[in-house]
Amino acid sequence: KPVEREELISRIESNLTYSRLAHRHNVSRNVNDNTENSPAYVKAILPRCDNEKDRKFIVKFLDIIESNYQDERFNRSRASELLAMSDRQLNRTLSKLLPDNFTMFLKKYRLEKSMPMLEQGLQITQIAFEVGFGSGAYYSRCFKQVYKVLPSEYEFSQPVETE
């Protein structure tokens, strides 16, 4: 899908800045560093992984989510296939590392990704399709479930709170 030029430049500059700092201070990257441009929801729930295996899993998992969240057909089965693990193993691993199951994580991730578009005043249906929801009505229901208000009524001066 097309990307806004300013957003792409901003992300590249941010990544370059971090790379320079990490190199200068000889800092190894952890999960939180890899999610610098992630939605607030992701930053809020990500644990500091105690071991390298969990850290690598989270980084790979987030890369897969970022690459596929806009596809409305993307689901746990497809994610587990891309991670080369069974659905059950993915469920066990996620329950160990995250407070939400896969479906809720993906839903909240998509909702967070929709916030800038909502703030710009784009139409609900357009936003819904852009972030992987099947319809504007379903997007609105999910938004209300998580934020306790419809997207059309959301005030951007408030801090974002999820359940």
Where does each model-flagged region fall?
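Short helix/strand-capping hinge loops at secondary-structure junctions
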Residues: 1-2, 19, 68-73, 101-102, ...
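C-terminal output helix
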Residues: 3-12, 16, 24
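Heptad-repeat coiled-coil signal-transmission/dimerization helices
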Residues: 8, 12, 58, 65, ...
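CheY-like receiver
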Residues: 19-60
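C-terminal end segment of the histidine kinase catalytic
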Residues: 20-26, 139, 161-163
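Basic, amphipathic alpha-helical hairpins
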Residues: 49, 62-74, 94, 98, ...
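Basic/polar phosphate-binding segments, predominantly the helix-turn-helix DNA-binding elements
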Residues: 76-105, 130-153
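Terminal helix-turn-helix DNA-binding modules in bacterial transcription factors
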Residues: 96-134, 156-163
